[in-house]
């Protein structure tokens, strides 16, 4: 199938892939065509960011789909390091709590399932969801904002 990749700025390109192709491979093909390093690319489909380790079929991406491409600045990844260490600290704390209440084998299973559920929930957030959440967190006293999604 042929996918159209549309950068926010610049010309779009087409890539030939299969439904079973991983997102990381699509990024490599885009890198060859547009000279944008794969680690600086963020591909979006219907407003949702695509994770490298998933296949196109996992997102129900079919023939002639159009993916949006956001190019990250070269040094942006370093800013996420402190955020990821905070997240790993949360998972470490969770492991400690689970160890107090479950056997080691059960604690590991619960921990693994919680991580999967968390990551699945994040993948399902659209850009609109993230924008509303950010607005609510940045302006908690705003009366006119739609807060129905927070229930």
UniProtKB/Swiss-Prot annotation:
Q: Which UniProt keywords apply?
A: Cytoplasm, Transport
Q: Which SUPFAM superfamilies match?
A: Ubiquitin-like
Q: Which Pfam families match?
A: Tugs (PF17840), ubiquitin (PF00240)
Against CDD domains, the record matches this protein to: Ubl_UBL4A_like
The record ties this protein, via PROSITE patterns, to: UBIQUITIN_1, UBIQUITIN_2
One cellular component term (GO) for this entry is: cytosol
User: Does this entry carry the keyword Transmembrane?
Assistant: no
Q: Its Gene Ontology biological processes?
A: post-translational protein targeting to endoplasmic reticulum membrane; tail-anchored membrane protein insertion into ER membrane
The molecule here is called Ubiquitin-like protein 4A-B
Where in this chain does the record put each Ubiquitin-like domain?
1-76
Q: What does this protein do?
A: Component of the BAT3 complex, a multiprotein complex involved in the post-translational delivery of tail-anchored (TA) membrane proteins to the endoplasmic reticulum membrane. TA membrane proteins, also named type II transmembrane proteins, contain a single C-terminal transmembrane region.
Where is it located?
Cytoplasm, Cytosol
Q: Has keyword Transport?
A: yes
Give the primary localization class. cytoplasm
Q: Which InterPro entries match?
A: Ubiquitin-like_dom, Ubiquitin-like_domsf, Ubiquitin_CS, Ubiquitin_dom, Ubl4_C_TUGS, UBL4A-like, Ubl_UBL4A-like
- Superkingdom to which the source organism belongs: Eukaryota
């Amino acid at each position: 199938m042929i996918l159209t990749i549309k950068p926010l700025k610049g010309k779009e390109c087409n890539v030939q892939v299969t439904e079973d192709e991983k997102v990381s491979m699509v990024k490599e093909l885009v890198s060859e065509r547009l000279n944008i390093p794969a680690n600086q690319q963020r591909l979006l489909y219907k407003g949702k960011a695509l994770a490298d380790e998933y296949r196109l079929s996992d997102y129900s991406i079919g023939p002639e789909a159009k993916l949006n491409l956001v190019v990250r600045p070269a040094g942006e990844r370093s800013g996420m390091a402190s955020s990821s260490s905070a997240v790993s600290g949360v998972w470490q704390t969770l492991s400690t709590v689970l160890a107090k209440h479950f056997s080691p084998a059960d604690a590991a299973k619960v921990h693994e399932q919680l991580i999967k559920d968390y990551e699945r929930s994040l993948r399902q957030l659209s850009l609109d969801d993230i924008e509303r959440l950010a607005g609510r967190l940045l302006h908690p006293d705003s009366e006119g904002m739609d807060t129905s999604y927070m229930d």
